[in-house]
Structures are given as structure tokens and as C-alpha cells.
């Protein structure tokens, strides 16, 4: 089976600067060096031409990379800031909500290598990294299988570990409040929150910062040791989402 690719939304701005240290190809042309795209009347303006979308693909997929400048990380958290980030894979630009959205198209296992290096320390123990790899892979593959609908879950005020999760009506407005005092409204994020890509790169989904964060041999070993493994229940991939403790 061919390894799937995931479309990861990285940033959305009216102006995006990026750099190709290596040669990439777009519309049968080769490009390199510093680049700029601008939102212009519903189109993407690049090198004095307007496009509905652009797809830059690496000539050497395993080694080539690109850099996005001023990517906002930790959105709405106390550590929110901008930084330059580097990525393997392809770079796609689309128009979305009067802005340009930059999307990284990357193999699932390469994506996971970055996730477990970005979500936690790349120097953690091998067994912890392996467990995280399986959990993150399970969550991702489950989201890729979702076809429609946003899930919202109510949790009873009993012990959280033993609480029964109840699926609410999918038509419930995601910003509404549940009036019943016996329940607490919990928002579950799904890939359907993103229309034009599979997952985003920030804490809304899983923290993904490309090859910006240094990986380690231990991370590579954890990915290889668990390659393709996911948690299942009754032949279905588990939605193995996890919470943050900040």
C-alpha cells in the first residue's frame, strides 16, 4: 500500500514570504531562492501573474526543503509568537477567506516525525516516543477517514476517567452553551473544522513545525518501530486524541 500524504495548513495571511534553498518545480518551471505571494482581488499574485492556486513540488522529495517566514505558533496561547519554519514535501497555496493559505503536503510518517518532536521533547525515552507515535498516528488516520459532521461531546461531572461520553446533535452550534447543569460542554475538534486541508499545524490539531525542531535518532527509531501501527477497536481506527497540560 502506498503511504498516504496529509495536507497540513501552516498559515493564512494576505502576504506570505518563503524561501527555496533547494530547487522546486511549479507549472513545469523550476524555481529557487526567496519568493513572495500576495492576495489580490481573490487571486494569488506571484511574479506578476494571478492564480487560483499554486503547487510547488520538490525535485528530490526525500531531501529538498522550503522555508516559510513569520509563521505564527501557539495561537491564542501565552507563548504565541512568529518564527521561520522549514519543511520537507510540497508547498501549496490556495485562496481562503480573503487570504492566502499555505499548505504543506507531506507523507504521513514524515509528518509524525515532526509532530512527536514538536509536541514533546525529542530527547524523551524511546518507549514514550513510540507510544506518542502510535497515538498521534491513530488520531490522524481517524480524522482522514471522517466524511462529514462535527462532533461535540458532553461529559458528566463524575470522575473524568469513568465518565460516559455522549454525542450531541451534530447541528448544535459550536459556540452555543449547554444549559443543563448536569453536563459540561466539551468541544471536540475534527478535520471538518478545516475545509481545504486535513489538519492544521498548531495546537488546534497537533503541533507540527516541520523540520524546524531538531529531531533525534530516538525519534526516527520510534517512528520506524511503530510504522503504520494504529490503535483499533472492532476493526475501526480509534480517535486517540490527547489533551494538553500547559
Residue ranges and their predicted role:
Residues 1-246:
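Conserved, single-site charged/polar hotspot
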Amino acid at each position: 500500500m502506498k503511504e498516504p500524504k496529509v495536507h497540513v495548513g501552516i498559515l493564512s495571511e494576505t502576504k506570505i514570504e518563503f524561501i527555496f534553498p533547494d530547487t522546486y518545480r511549479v507549472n513545469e518551471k523550476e524555481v529557487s531562492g526567496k519568493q513572495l505571494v500576495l492576495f489580490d482581488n481573490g487571486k494569488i499574485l506571484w511574479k506578476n501573474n494571478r492564480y487560483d492556486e499554486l503547487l510547488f513540488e520538490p525535485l528530490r522529495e526525500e531531501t529538498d526543503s522550503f522555508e516559510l517566514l513569520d509563521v505564527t505558533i501557539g495561537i491564542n496561547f501565552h507563548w504565541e509568537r512568529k518564527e521561520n519554519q522549514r519543511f520537507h514535501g510540497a508547498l501549496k497555496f490556495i485562496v481562503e477567506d480573503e487570504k492566502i493559505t499555505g499548505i504543506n503536503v507531506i507523507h504521513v510518517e514524515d509528518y509524525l516525525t515532526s509532530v512527536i518532536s514538536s509536541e514533546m521533547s525529542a530527547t524523551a525515552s524511546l518507549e514514550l516516543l513510540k507510544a506518542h507515535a502510535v497515538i498521534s498516528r491513530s488520531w490522524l488516520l481517524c480524522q482522514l477517514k471522517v466524511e462529514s459532521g462535527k462532533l461535540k461531546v458532553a461529559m458528566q461531572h463524575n470522575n473524568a476517567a469513568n465518565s460516559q461520553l455522549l454525542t450531541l446533535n451534530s447541528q448544535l452550534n459550536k459556540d452555543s452553551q449547554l444549559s443543563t447543569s448536569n453536563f459540561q460542554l466539551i468541544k471536540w475538534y475534527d478535520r471538518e473544522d478545516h475545509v481545504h486541508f486535513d489538519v492544521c499545524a498548531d495546537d488546534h490539531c497537533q503541533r507540527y513545525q516541520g523540520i524546524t525542531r531538531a529531531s533525534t535518532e530516538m525519534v526516527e527509531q520510534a517512528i520506524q518501530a511503530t510504522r503504520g501501527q494504529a490503535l483499533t477497536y472492532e476493526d475501526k481506527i480509534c480517535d486517540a486524541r490527547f489533551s494538553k497540560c500547559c
